[in-house]
Amino acid sequence: MQNNSTSFPTAIFLMGPTASGKTDLAIKLHETLPVEIISVDSALIYKGMDIGTAKPSKEELALAPHRLIDILDPAESYSAMNFRADALREMTDITAQGKIPLLVGGTMLYYKALIEGLSPLPNADEKIRSEIEARAQQTGWAVLHQELAKIDPASAARINPNDSQRINRALEVFYLTGKSLTELTAQKGDALPYNVLQFAIAPEDRSILHERIELRFKKMVELGFKAEVEKLYARSDLSPDLPSIRCVGYRQMWEHLRGDYGFDEAIYRGICATRQLAKRQITWLRGWKTPIRWLNSLQNEKNQKKIQQVFYLSMQNR
């Protein structure tokens, strides 16, 4: 869990759904506070995926550099565990320079991993996964779900009998460790050694967010989003099974290039998928376990002042 002790250095979290104005506000804060920005975004980590991720422009990055952007090729995978290790390293470096880490983004799972620590879950084992898949082909996933119910009733109650991926993972964890997924996830890792000031930004009216998402997606298309995905599609080492290609927008454009549906349909589906992502992000934030100060996307100047006031007040109380 997060530490609130004043003996710990300060960090700022600026969270929010996609298209809520996080980047613009972060750049403004970089101009007025002694902060260095760390990206908390599972799409911005990939090189060559600039337009569809709304990655900060070269000009914006020159004004306010973002760490943990463009660190991986799209063929590579990246986990919450990878992020936590990388983010803690960057936070330590920023703190050592006498500055404040400002973590900005909308990948809520990464924030959760950073604040709460990670359960000691084993890495995937392809051999065991293949064996489980083979059994499922013979008996059906419903039978394996019944097996899971005997091993781990709590997980079985949460997992739909048709959710093959989650059934496979829960059984895999048990076969590897001899312990249930429920038991292992109850064990948390180390607490975050920072006093975190948490902010979330979003429009008060969700229809405004929906409109912004549509306008931004159409702007991406004008800027050459399809051509960007075409370059990825031409690579033999990329597929829609990879996390990079599953990113909203990219998946829909990829399916269009594959011939699944037309260009206009890809745009429509991309907008819908982005809105669904925003809804999930807001749901995460509404259920956040630690205190969050909410900001209105339409009041950026006021938001900047509010964060400054909270920051300086926290520093006075140290």
UniProtKB/Swiss-Prot annotation:
Task: Write out the residues that bind ATP.
Answer: G16, P17, T18, A19, S20, G21, K22, T23
Q: Which reaction does it catalyse?
A: adenosine(37) in tRNA + dimethylallyl diphosphate = N(6)-dimethylallyladenosine(37) in tRNA + diphosphate
Site Interaction with substrate tRNA: which residues? T107, R129
Q: Where are the transmembrane segments?
A: none
Q: Which residues form a coiled coil?
A: none
UniProt: substrate binding residues: T18, A19, S20, G21, K22, T23
| Signal peptide positions (record) | none
- Supply the EC number(s): 2.5.1.75
Co-factor(s): Mg(2+)
Gene3D superfamilies on file: 1.10.20.140, P-loop containing nucleotide triphosphate hydrolases
Example of a GO MF term: ATP binding
Keywords linked to the UniProt accession = ATP-binding, Magnesium, Nucleotide-binding, Transferase, tRNA processing
One GO BP on record is: tRNA modification
So which domain of life are we looking at?
A: Bacteria
Region feature (Interaction with substrate tRNA): 41-44, 165-169, 246-251, 279-286
Question: Which family is it part of?
Answer: Belongs to the IPP transferase family.
> What is the recorded function of this protein according to its Swiss-Prot or TrEMBL entry?
Catalyzes the transfer of a dimethylallyl group onto the adenine at position 37 in tRNAs that read codons beginning with uridine, leading to the formation of N6-(dimethylallyl)adenosine (i(6)A).
Q: How does it associate, per the subunit comment? A: Monomer.
Instruction: From the Swiss-Prot or TrEMBL record, give the protein name.
Output: tRNA dimethylallyltransferase
Tell me what organism the protein belongs to: Actinobacillus succinogenes (strain ATCC 55618 / DSM 22257 / CCUG 43843 / 130Z)
Q: What is the lineage of its organism?
A: Bacteria, Pseudomonadati, Pseudomonadota, Gammaproteobacteria, Pasteurellales
State the gene name recorded for this protein.
miaA
